[in-house]
Amino acid sequence: MMKNKNLCKILYYTDRDALDRPALTEKQCAALMGKNIKIIPKLYVDSSVLAYVIISMDNFAPSTNPQFKDNIISFDIICHFDQWQLKDFQLRPYRIAAEIDSMFDNQHLTGIGELHFMGASQIILNDEFGGLTLLYQAIHGGEDKKNAPNPADNKKIVDDFNELHNQSFIPLDTFISNE
């Protein structure tokens, strides 16, 4: 998310012309994480921060890949109502949603799965903050198994070892005479 220059500008600048403002430095983009972009679903309202994206995972379910579970990833986009309006009749939370959707819809993220847009709904927190929730289904397939240990591989190694060991093994009783 930090590599999306438009998203960083919309979150960082509170002006209507946020997209026309200079690109953020790497340090400024990195500072958005934890301040504007959160993975802990607790919102501390900061008077200097007026746009937030809260990322959470929920509704875990079994998948075809036993290493991972399918789940729903939600992006809660919260903006101060005074900051909703951007230039050209664009609305800040909807523009943030468009940037997020362009990055995640139908994309495969290693260890998370393939994301599919499920829908969006408006959220109103209070008389000052509101926005949207975007929902994506994360589906884990076999491609995420590539680097995961496979018990069947271990069985083949054990079988090969036993076969080799048993071929070179001469039972002790062949050396003992029963006379």
Spans of model-derived segments:
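Small/polar-rich, solvent-exposed N-terminal microdomains that initiate assembly or binding
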Residues: 1-63, 158-179
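Residue-level recognition of well-ordered beta-strand positions that form the cores
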Residues: 56-58, 74-78, 135-139
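Short glycine/proline-enriched loop/turn "hinge" motifs that connect secondary-structure elements
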Residues: 63-69, 126
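A generic structural signal for short coil/turn motifs at secondary-structure boundaries
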Residues: 64, 84-88
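Short acidic, glycine/tyrosine-flanked loop/strand segments centered on an H-E-D-like triad
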Residues: 70-85
